[in-house]
């Protein structure tokens, strides 16, 4: 990561997807959770802005697995290992192994592709749609914690940083509304 920084990179995105090794194995991620967390730490230490993505709504994940993923997302943000995070619901896109598995197991709630926009669960899960949406929202709410806000303020180095934080705050509010339970 130091070489990336030296070469002019400023940003790196890690698709963590889940904090559960079984899920990572089932979706053929090819990584261990510990390795991904360590990568976030090393990239941040090298001076790169780390963005992390996580997803909720895998058909085999229950409450424990959801809590693990929420906790990991919040921890990465609170400790500053990730500067930003995106949490969404998992979408089984046609043609993927996950989509095929959904068809084989009758896990799809809809085949209306206009609804495959990551704003609502598409797959049946053990915990229900409302709980998944609550999990997505709970990760975004860490942006309102005193530690996270203080770290962002201390990290301001330029007017560009101020504008970025303003845009990011707007997006957080937007995502909270996107995933608000009806």
Provide a role label for each language-model segment.
Residues 1-160:
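A structural motif corresponding to the C-terminal lobe/cap of the Radical SAM core domain
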Residues 144-182:
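Membrane-proximal basic amphipathic "stem/tether" segments
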């Amino acid at each position: 990561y130091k070489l990336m920084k030296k070469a002019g990179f400023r940003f790196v995105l890690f698709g963590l997807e889940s904090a559960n090794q079984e899920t990572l194995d089932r979706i053929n991620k090819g990584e261990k959770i510990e390795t991904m967390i360590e990568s976030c730490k090393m990239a941040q230490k090298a001076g790169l802005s780390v963005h992390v993505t996580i997803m909720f709504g895998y058909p085999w994940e229950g409450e424990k697995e959801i809590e693990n993923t929420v906790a990991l997302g919040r921890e990465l943000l609170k400790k500053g290992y990730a500067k930003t995070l995106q949490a969404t619901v998992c979408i089984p896109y046609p043609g993927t192994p996950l989509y095929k598995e959904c068809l084989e197991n009758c896990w799809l709630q809809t085949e209306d592709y206009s609804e495959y926009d990551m704003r609502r669960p598409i797959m049946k899960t053990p915990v229900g749609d409302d709980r998944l949406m609550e999990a997505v929202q709970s990760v975004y709410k860490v942006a309102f914690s005193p530690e996270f806000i203080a770290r962002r303020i201390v990290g301001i180095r330029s007017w560009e940083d101020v504008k970025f934080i303003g845009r990011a705050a707007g997006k957080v509010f937007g995502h909270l509304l996107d995933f608000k339970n009806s």
